[in-house]
């Protein structure tokens, strides 16, 4: 497993609409392998893996992470921020963060906020400034992006910890597929899509799908269980138990034919799956499957512990198994298979 790539993706700072640091990593890989690259109007990256007269398949992961944006600067030097995406309440107080200025300078600070019951409001970043002028002299302006200041770490037992695993694990899988299959003979035309602005409303998933117009889509994302050390039967997001196969969420109910086919292929190659349902939230799949006249879509990905906060934990074996499964699915997506998956008669 390429831990240096995962580290680079995790430590890149990219809230919605400001995903250039992640985009650059993907573009360097695509350029190195001389792949065609397109963009949608929001900045999503569309990499054409191969040419084929077969069906068109889209593999999608989002680039953005939850974070904050500078809203205003007080006379005393407090930097008021607003959340971008659904940042956990517990992660809105006393957290190291970094501000990325328009000049791409990184300025560390401490995030804090006012707690009222279970809510945290009036969030601000302290960079040690004593006045408005000192903040301005540091180059900070309203609109600058703020992300958690988290260093990627390798943990015991093939596990890793870092920020923005939602959805840099998906972006990592896009790159590994690009590397593995860049010169393979495939039965389908495959587009690897890194979408913009998922955390603020599944935006790039919609616009990128319009640009690709796929016959089938696989969306990569992550999720965690509310109680990280609950290993009971209801928890289908346990790290180390294999990738998640999301049967339904608030925005998408996956076609049973498609999920059954994924389960069959996974069993053939010996990859365990955790069949899961999200009672809250959704993924790019919600936007993807409603594009055009409808796109058969399934959501999969590695489970994590903790999410939408300063750091998550994942198991490298889950990531590798997800890569194995994606490769196997892509190599089996013949025109006949797609016809069978989309036949409603």
Curated annotation (Swiss-Prot):
A divalent metal cation 2 binds at residues 166, 199, 308. A divalent metal cation 1 binds at residues 62, 166, 221. Belongs to the peptidase M42 family. It is an enzyme of class 3 (hydrolase). Its cofactor is Co(2+); Ni(2+); Mn(2+); Cu(2+). Its EC number is 3.4.11.-. This is Aminopeptidase YpdE. GO terms for molecular function: aminopeptidase activity; metal ion binding; metalloaminopeptidase activity; metallopeptidase activity. InterPro entries: Peptidase_M42, Peptidase_M42_aminopept, Peptidase_M42_dom2. The gene is ypdE. Signal peptide: none annotated. The active site is at residue 198.
